[in-house]
């Protein structure tokens, strides 16, 4: 299935139903009074996270999603039915953004999390609400309010503990294959990886972490060169970044310069992302001798002013890979993910209906019936006719 990590859709909540102007007309009950019911509330639009989905391809072609409109009120004090809600299933890790205001509505980071993205309109009031001691036959009502309508940008951001950075052909996909059961495509040409992929690295029987591989970056990626930087968003939720460097590039480029290019592109994309913990890992040491690799790595680290530790591995042969994964696992366990306490069930906000009704009644709509009277006529289905006789 094709990997789609962005989708722009239109969500429309249902409008509230209008109130009804009606009067009770029944045999033996003269002047029965108002009995117009309220309308129904409009339906809402929700997003829910589903761990069984891994792409937004379902929203690539179908762009508009509308909830049901609330029914209008009816006579006999009957309230209209509420409009039907709709729930859209999206992958875990999806972020919802209002495309007009760029407001982040929320992130769905756990399976089953549910988020309201468009609120339905409130119901209108029937003429029964306007009955009073001085207004026995009210002909006022209110209409329902419109539901929310939004252009919603959905962004899928992979949830991983470790993110891989590097130029094309640095060996990122080979590393994923070495530490996990994932089998991303590996070849001897640039941009073999075209879409992000995930792998689960197991360290022992009950210890594991998730690693994300994204397409390689090149100089000018921030300006759209290569595959651009659109996939860097998948690293925003990682706890540590692994910067994989080819210690002896086949194109004879300078590894120190290559490191600077990646750091520059990362900073241009997001200053916050560039401040994440980053480990420097030199790959393909099997292509040169171990002593030469040590000396070359030391020289590169001095050129870029690297003050932290660095690793030398060969993802192709597995040399030193186990030590690296063990240290990554220890770091992840020592630095648990900082997640704000989120209620999986959204706090229910109780709408102040009394205040809404009071405000709505200040600006009612008055029905003007040219031939309105409360007396019975032959056109009425049923009722009581008053016959006055002179005694």
Swiss-Prot record:
Organism superkingdom: Bacteria
Annotated family: Belongs to the TRAFAC class OBG-HflX-like GTPase superfamily. OBG GTPase family.
Function: An essential GTPase which binds GTP, GDP and possibly (p)ppGpp with moderate affinity, with high nucleotide exchange rates and a fairly low GTP hydrolysis rate. Plays a role in control of the cell cycle, stress response, ribosome biogenesis and in those bacteria that undergo differentiation, in morphogenesis control.
GO terms (BP aspect): ribosome biogenesis
OBG-type G domain residues: 160-333
Entry EC number(s): 3.6.5.-
Binding of GTP, residues: 166-173, 191-195, 213-216, 283-286, 314-316
Record-annotated Obg domain positions: 1-159
Subcellular location: Cytoplasm
A single MF term (Gene Ontology): GTP binding
Single GO cellular component term: cytoplasm
Protein name: GTPase Obg
Keyword check for Hydrolase: yes
Major site of localization recorded for this protein: cytoplasm
InterPro entries (UniProt xref): G_OBG, GTP-bd, GTP-bd_Obg/CgtA, GTP1-OBG_CS, GTP1_OBG_dom, GTP1_OBG_dom_sf, OBG_GTPase, P-loop_NTPase
Subunit structure: Monomer.
Name of a matching Pfam family: MMR_HSR1
This protein's UniProt keywords: Cytoplasm, GTP-binding, Hydrolase, Magnesium, Metal-binding, Nucleotide-binding
Cofactor section: Mg(2+)
Residues noted as binding Mg(2+) in the record, renumbered to the chain: 173, 193
Enzyme class per UniProt: hydrolase
């Amino acid at each position: 299935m094709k990997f789609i990590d962005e989708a722009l859709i239109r969500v429309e909540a249902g409008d509230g139903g209008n109130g009804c102007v009606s009067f009770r007309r029944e045999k033996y009950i003269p002047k029965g009074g108002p009995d117009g019911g309220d309308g129904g509330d409009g339906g809402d639009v929700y997003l829910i996270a589903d761990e069984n989905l891994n792409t937004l391809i379902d929203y690539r072609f179908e762009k508009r999603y509308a909830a049901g409109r609330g029914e209008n009120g009816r006579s006999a004090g009957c309230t209209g039915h509420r409009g039907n809600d709709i729930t859209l299933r999206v992958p875990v890790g999806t972020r919802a953004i209002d495309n007009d205001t760029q407001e982040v509505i929320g992130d769905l980071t756990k399976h089953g999390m549910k988020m309201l993205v468009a609120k339905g309109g409130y119901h209108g009031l029937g003429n029964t609400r306007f009955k009073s001691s001085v207004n026995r036959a009210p002909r006022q009502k209110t209409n329902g309010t419109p539901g929310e309508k939004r252009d919603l940008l959905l962004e899928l951001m992979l949830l991983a503990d470790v993110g891989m950075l590097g130029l094309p052909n640095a060996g990122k996909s080979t590393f994923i294959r070495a530490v996990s059961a994932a089998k991303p495509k590996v070849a001897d040409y640039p941009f073999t990886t075209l879409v992000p992929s995930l792998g689960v690295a197991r360290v022992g029987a009950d210890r594991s972490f998730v690693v994300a591989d994204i397409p390689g970056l090149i100089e000018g990626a921030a300006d759209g060169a290569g595959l651009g930087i659109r996939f860097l968003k998948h690293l925003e939720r990682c706890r540590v970044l692994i910067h994989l460097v080819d210690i002896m590039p086949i194109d004879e480029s300078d590894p120190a310069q290559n490191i600077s290019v990646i750091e520059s592109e990362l900073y241009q994309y997001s200053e916050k992302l560039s401040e994440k913990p980053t480990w420097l890992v030199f790959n393909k040491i099997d292509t040169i001798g171990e002593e030469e690799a040590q000396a070359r790595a030391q020289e590169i680290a001095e050129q870029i002013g690297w003050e932290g530790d660095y690793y030398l591995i060969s993802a192709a042969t597995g040399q030193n890979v186990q030590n690296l994964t063990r240290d990554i696992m220890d770091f992840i366990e020592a630095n648990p993910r900082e997640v704000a306490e989120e209620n999986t069930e959204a706090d229910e906000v109780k709408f102040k209906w009394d205040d809404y009704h009071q405000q709505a009644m200040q600006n009612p709509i008055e029905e003007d019936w040219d031939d309105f009277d409360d007396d019975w006529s032959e056109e009425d289905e049923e009722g009581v006719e008053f016959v006055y006789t002179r005694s």
